[in-house]
Amino acid sequence: LYCILCRFSSRFFYYLCKFPWEPHRYKEGYRERKVLVRMKQYNVGVIGATGMVGQRFITLLENHPWFNLVALAASARSAGKTYEEAVGSRWLMKTPMPESVKKMVVLDAANVEEVAAKVDFVFCAVNMKKDEIKALEEAYAKAECPVVSNNSAHRFTPDVPMVVPEINADHIDIIPAQRKRLGTKRGFVAVKSNCSLQSYVPALHPLRKYGISDVLVCTYQAISGAGKTFETFPDILDNVIPYIGGEEEKSEQ
């Protein structure tokens, strides 16, 4: 998960947010030099901040040069509490909870306008039914708050770009069509691929020019990408699930 989100929070945002260090040329005598000029940081929020993936977002965003974490949102039962109170003993990361978020008051993710007013865009990692996730993410987009989603709900929405930046960065060109559908000027939803695809597609893509048309792929998954442990998922203790139905078709699509 750490490797997945590290790629997600570096390369993916390069294409979606514009790299915040932009090259500028200036002439010094007869020589032309290229320098890096520091651009603004983006104020960002995490929706689903108390869950495992939300916690990982928080650790990755700590002291980040591009992003300033200013809003944490979760379910109504966490809203109004400090982040430290809301998470309690459920902090699952190996590193300590960042001091910068401990006293931040958690917002209700359903209060879209309140969250959207504080940020340039949000990262979304909520644990809800897919139709509820779709509705929530589009609500943020319609509030003119771009959504970068770790969820799978919009991966097959035709006008939502699913980006593996080394392969299909140009897919963000579909965003104007999505904005037209949603009636937005700035808001949109963009998603990452599933963890399996983003691990092997970058390696396979360059081989296409050599005529390779079919590949047999076997993946070996961790216990859970959602934070389940042996205690909360006893079926996996001393066990292996040899086949997970629907995964092949999902990846082929």
Where are these regions (language model features)?
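N-terminal Rossmann-like NAD(P) cofactor-binding subdomain of oxidoreductases
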Residues: R33-E248
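Basic polycationic patches enriched in arginine
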Residues: R7, R11, R25, R31-R33, ...
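Cysteine-centered motifs
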Residues: C3-C6, C17
